[in-house]
Amino acid sequence: MPQPQQLPGPNADIWDWQMRGLCRGVDSSMFFHPDGERGRARAQREMRAKEMCRSCPVIAQCRSHALAVGEPYGIWGGLSESERELLLKRGIRRSA
C-alpha cells in the first residue's frame, strides 16, 4: 500500500492527468479484480482494461504514478499488479 509520504501533495495540477484518462467515468470493476477472480475471467478483464489503456492519452502519467507510489492493485497505465511488481523488482520506477 502506498505510504502517505510517497504520495504527491494536494496540488491539483499533479492530479490533472486523471481528468483526461479514458477510464474516467468507467466502472472500476474493469480495472480492479473482484475477490476470487482467477484464470480466464481475470485474463479477459485485464485484456479489456489494457486495450483501453493502450489508446489513452495519459498512459505514461498513469504508469509513472503507479510505479512511483507502488499501487498494489488494479490495471494502471496498461500494467497489471504482477507486471508492475516485476518492473519494481528490476529497479524501474518509471516507464512510459
Curated annotation (Swiss-Prot):
InterPro entries: 4FE4S_WBL (IPR034768), Whib (IPR003482). One of its GO terms (cellular component) is cytoplasm. Its cofactor is [4Fe-4S] cluster. Induction: Constitutively expressed. Disruption phenotype: Not essential. It is found in: Cytoplasm. Binds 1 [4Fe-4S] cluster per subunit. Following nitrosylation of the [4Fe-4S] cluster binds 1 [4Fe-8(NO)] cluster per subunit. GO terms for molecular function: 4 iron, 4 sulfur cluster binding; dinitrosyl-iron complex binding; DNA binding; metal ion binding; protein-disulfide reductase [NAD(P)H] activity. Keywords: 4Fe-4S, Cytoplasm, Disulfide bond, DNA-binding, Iron, Iron-sulfur, Metal-binding, Transcription, Transcription regulation. Its main location: cytoplasm. The keyword DNA-binding applies. A redox-sensitive transcriptional regulator. Maintains intracellular redox homeostasis by regulating catabolic metabolism and polyketide biosynthesis. Regulates expression of the redox buffer ergothioneine (ERG). In concert with myothiol (MSH), another redox buffer, responds to low pH leading to acid resistance. The apo- but not holo-form probably binds DNA. This is Redox-responsive transcriptional regulator WhiB3. It comes from Mycolicibacterium smegmatis (strain ATCC 700084 / mc(2)155) (Mycobacterium smegmatis). The gene is whiB3.
